[in-house]
Design a protein with these regions (language model features):
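NAD(P)+-binding Rossmann beta1-loop-alpha1 motif at the extreme N-terminus of oxidoreductases
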Residues: 1-56, 63-67, 73
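N-terminal Rossmann-like NAD(P) cofactor-binding module of classical short-chain dehydrogenase/reductase
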Residues: 79-80
Length: 81
C-alpha cells in the first residue's frame, strides 16, 4: 500500500531518519526539511545521514531535501515532526 499525498519529514536527527526510512518504504518520494545545508549536501553525497543512524542507506533520488521550511510545508500534504 502506497501512502497518499506528499509527505514531509521535519528535522534531521535520529528520529526523523528512522521515520523517513519507514515512510519511504510506503511512498514513492518524500520532502525532507533539514536546518543545515552542509548536512543535506553530505547526506546526498554519502547516501545516509552523516550524524545519525549512519548504517541506514537511502535512495537519494526519492528525497527532495531543503533547508527552506516554508517551501517544504507548501509542497507537502502531511508533515511528520
Amino acid at each position: 500500500m502506497k501512502l497518499p499525498g506528499k509527505i514531509a519529514i521535519m528535522g534531521g536527527g535520529s528520529w526523523a531518519t528512522a521515520i523517513a526510512k519507514i515512510v519511504l518504504a510506503q511512498a514513492e518520494s518524500i520532502n525532507w526539511y533539514m536546518r543545515r545545508d552542509d548536512r543535506i549536501e553530505e547526506f546526498k553525497r554519502l547516501g545516509h545521514n552523516p550524524a545519525y543512524l549512519t548504517s541506514v542507506r537511502f535512495e537519494i533520488k526519492n528525497i527532495n531535501f531543503s533547508s527552506d521550511i516554508n517551501k517544504i510545508v507548501k509542497e507537502s500534504d502531511t508533515l511528520i515532526f
